[in-house]
């Protein structure tokens, strides 16, 4: 193994609320694959909700910024390494809040006044990154390939990015820091590096409905139905996504959609990190966390390793 392939990069890891419940399989598989691809994840101490949902309920912009500021102040206390998260909503909200604090002197002052109540302060010097971008720019597909011991040969994967993961880059970097917004390729590249076959998927950045599923479920069902129809038409064995809410919505609403529209969808929806964990030969449950998926993929389960 070359010196480059042994290189390890350290990050402050922000798991986010979904990692404690609906997206435990994302968190567990990310932690499992990180050392395999040279990433050291130091969990953020005493982290709180990013505010993607509750932070917008009332009180204006400050409560939301203060939630972001508190996390980043704690991260600053752990060192100057970049902050990384695997959750699209956490990333979008924390990235946006961080940029606001960095560029708006008045906002930064108000945030630090709020943080002072907890003896905290944030300088605005940290960078917030999404795990997918880190894998693209710090790891690369060649390193992923070098760790594959159990190639996912014959597994057809529809890469569903969702609408949030690449959005801040599209807004602030003139089209994307690591990929384009309209036609991102990174999930396809990840799947191919693992030995799987990416399939054409024209709705890869369509919205799944997000939290609208709570307020207006009928609208969400139509959005998800389109995603499932495209995946089925492409012959996908599984749908791969980086987003906890996308994974939950597209997986959990299939039964409801089948009953409402007379369809027969039963398409497994997994996180890209679960595919990597299987390809790296990690334990199917302790590494890939396949036991946490509601819809099982017989094909992927058959490829996964079970270790004592």
Q: Which positions does each model-derived feature cover?
A:
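Iron-sulfur cluster-binding electron-transfer modules in prokaryotic oxidoreductases
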Residues: 1-308
